[in-house]
Curated annotation (Swiss-Prot):
Signal peptide start-end: 1-26
Lineage of the organism: Eukaryota, Metazoa, Chordata, Craniata, Vertebrata
Main location: membrane
Species the sequence originates in: Homo sapiens
Residues passing through the membrane, by range: 493-513
Residue numbers on the Cytoplasmic membrane side: 514-618
Sequence ranges assigned to domain DSL in this UniProt record: 176-215
UniProt xrefs under PANTHER family: CRUMBS FAMILY MEMBER, DROSOPHILA CRUMBS HOMOLOG
Protein name, per record: Delta-like protein 3
UniProt keyword annotation of Nucleus present: no
Reported disease: Spondylocostal dysostosis 1, autosomal recessive: A condition of variable severity associated with vertebral and rib segmentation defects. The main skeletal malformations include fusion of vertebrae, hemivertebrae, fusion of certain ribs, and other rib malformations. Deformity of the chest and spine (severe scoliosis, kyphoscoliosis and lordosis) is a natural consequence of the malformation and leads to a dwarf-like appearance.
One GO BP annotation of this record: somitogenesis
Length: 618
């Protein structure tokens, strides 16, 4: 246990140590003067700060922070904080009007040791100390808190301000001043008289660079041009833009220099390129930047001020928010305002319309409509939903008549109709020959699977579109080298393809014979498959599709054949009468049953029920 004598000796030692410790002088002091605190204007103002009509007294706390943001008072006060003394005791008088409350005497002073930032945030709290018969002593409670951000240069005059917190109103003044030997708007330059002795002891280096500018200006190098040169240290000569040389008397030749900025080059006499203080335009809110010999200067537009035009002097009373924006704050020119924009607008003053449709929120080709308060999508047919995200079934509840098939797509149903029917729902009778598809006078015949053209003499093709002998020459391919025009092998196909076609013909013939179950079809099939020489497959000869020619090559009998009127066949059918080999040609589907057998000794004509090659076997 420490004795009273030892305790007193320890206290004296601590006090002496604190006295003789080296004290760091502050760069400056922020001073706050409270003028009045009381009920604000308007209805509902309180009559007394004291609760239950007990006596109370007020005191104030200030917290300073650098930067542009107003922060909570509980966070660290980077620039410092101060607490005032207690004010006079106040007791409410019944029936008396609410007066301004008695305030503590003196200033609230916040010393700062670093450079003054220029732009700062403040939080001022008003506390109430109740002096009734509380158990445990007085009780403290927060009565009001105001905050703001300001632009303030050190060394300037007092600035006045009014802030309201709920029903209370606070009027105050503030300033920032430098403590000698610090000078300047940021208290960063040190100044001492020329005759002042050194602050440091013998053999010690200077504590900080001192500038002799209190009594006399700096003395530059002898002969330094006063118009084109300047100095920041005694005995130097630094040139302004466009001038060079030891004394800044030589103009820079712009014809051979890359940039008129930076230190001069001893070899070329030009200025070496370097970054400038206005590069990137440090001035905000549309301010214009101009370089000075030592830094830059911003010329701010109307309504803004500050070193970089970062502080707005416009208040909510000026109506700065457009398009129905709500203005908050900005009670005086030194406080900032904030615009809360309605949906569809953005910007510091709600001056920019948000193009929400540029994000293409509507799917499946829907049309985006920005109504300001809401976004709407106009969907294409066949789609639904807030963003047209649902694909509707176009064929639901819709049927196509007469065997038609519903095809979905394009936001509407479409019917693919069977042959002979048309219209939206296949309810209308349609004639495939109504459009006259057969060219050059050909006759059109309707069929259950399509249409067939009977061509006029001299034309051929599915639609009679090809002349048989254009300009006196055959329209069929020319004979291969080494073959004569009349040679039966003139249009001979490759052997492998011929075998493949022959096998296909035989299989198709057997299948048709079995399906139709005609008694004479077996004999015809036997004659086709038995006793027939190795067939060869050829391209069509000149006698093709409506060409009259003479058949008789080989050992068979010669007869005149009319290709427009085949024997023993309905005139609507189209056939190819064979030579001693198998010929192939793509033609339209015939009109009648798939097999026709002629009389004994005559040729058999094989007709297929689907679009295919019409073949005949001798």
């Amino acid at each position: 246990m420490v004795s009273p004598r030892m305790s007193g000796l320890l206290s004296q030692t601590v006090i002496l140590a604190l006295i003789f410790l080296p004290q760091t002088r502050p760069a400056g002091v922020f001073e706050l003067q409270i003028h009045s605190f009381g009920p604000g204007p308007g209805p509902g103002a309180p009559r007394s700060p004291c609760s239950a009509r007990l006596p109370c007294r007020l005191f104030f706390r200030v917290c300073l922070k650098p930067g542009l943001s107003e922060e909570a008072a509980e966070s660290p006060c980077a620039l410092g904080a101060a607490l005032s003394a207690r004010g006079p005791v106040y007791t409410e008088q019944p029936g008396a009007p609410a007066p301004d409350l008695p305030l503590p005497d003196g200033l609230l002073q916040v010393p700062f040791r670093d450079a003054w930032p220029g732009t700062f945030s403040f939080i001022i709290e008003t506390w109430r100390e109740e002096l009734g018969d509380q158990i445990g002593g007085p009780a403290w409670s927060l009565l009001a808190r105001v905050a703001g951000r300001r632009r303030l240069a050190a060394g300037g005059p007092w600035a006045r301000d009014i802030q309201r917190a709920g029903a209370w109103e606070l009027r105050f003044s503030y300033r920032a001043r430098c403590e000698p030997p610090a000078v300047g708007t940021a208290c960063t330059r040190l100044c001492r008289p020329r005759s002042a002795p050194s602050r440091c002891g013998p053999g010690l280096r200077p504590c900080a660079p001192l500038e002799d500018e209190c009594e006399a200006p700096l003395v530059c190098r002898a002969g330094c041009s006063p118009e084109h040169g300047f100095c920041e240290q005694p005995g130097e000569c630094r040139c302004l833009e466009g001038w060079t040389g030891p004394l800044c008397t030589v103009p820079v030749s712009t014809s051979s220099c890359l940039s008129p900025r930076g230190p001069s080059s001893a070899t070329t006499g030009c200025l070496v390129p370097g970054p400038g203080p206005c590069d990137g335009n440090p001035c905000a809110n549309g301010g214009s930047c101009s370089e000075t010999p030592r830094s830059f200067e911003c010329t701010c537009p109307r309504g803004f001020y500050g070193l970089r035009c970062e502080v707005s002097g416009v208040t909510c009373a000026d109506g700065p928010c457009f398009n129905g924006g709500l203005c908050v704050g900005g009670a005086d020119p030194d406080s900032a305002y904030i615009c809360h924009c309605p949906p569809g607008f953005q910007g510091s003053n709600c001056e920019k319309r948000v193009d929400r449709c540029s994000l293409q929120p509507c799917r499946n080709g829907g049309l985006c409509l920005d109504l300001g308060h809401a976004l709407r999508c106009r969907c294409r047919a066949g789609f639904a939903g807030p963003r047209c995200e649902h694909d509707l079934d176009d064929c639901a509840g819709r049927a196509c008549a007469n065997g038609g098939t519903c095809v979905e797509g394009g936001g509407a149903h479409r019917c693919s109709c069977a042959l002979g029917f048309g219209g939206r729902d296949c309810r209308e009778r349609a004639d495939p020959c109504a459009a006259r598809p057969c060219a050059h006078g050909g006759r059109c015949y309707a069929h259950f699977s399509g249409l067939v053209c009977a061509c006029a003499p001299g034309y051929m093709g599915a639609r009679c579109e090809f002349p048989v002998h254009p300009d006196g020459a055959s329209a069929l391919p020319a004979a291969p080298p080494g073959l004569r025009p009349g040679d039966p092998q003139r249009y001979l196909l490759p052997p492998a393809l011929g075998l493949l076609v022959a096998a296909g013909v035989a299989g198709a013939a057997l299948l048709l014979v079995h399906v139709r179950r005609r008694g004479h079809s077996q004999d015809a099939g036997s004659r086709l498959l038995a006793g027939t020489p190795e067939p060869s497959v050829h391209a069509l000869p000149d006698a093709l599709n409506n060409l009259r020619t003479q058949e008789g090559s080989g050992d068979g009998p010669s007869s005149s054949v009319d290709w427009n009127r085949p024997e023993d066949v309905d005139p609507q059918g189209i056939y190819v009468i064979s030579a001693p080999s198998i010929y192939a040609r793509e033609v339209a589907t015939p009109l009648f049953p798939p097999l026709h057998t002629g009389r004994a000794g005559q040729r058999q004509h094989l007709l297929f029920p689907y679009p295919s090659s019409i073949l005949s076997v001798k």
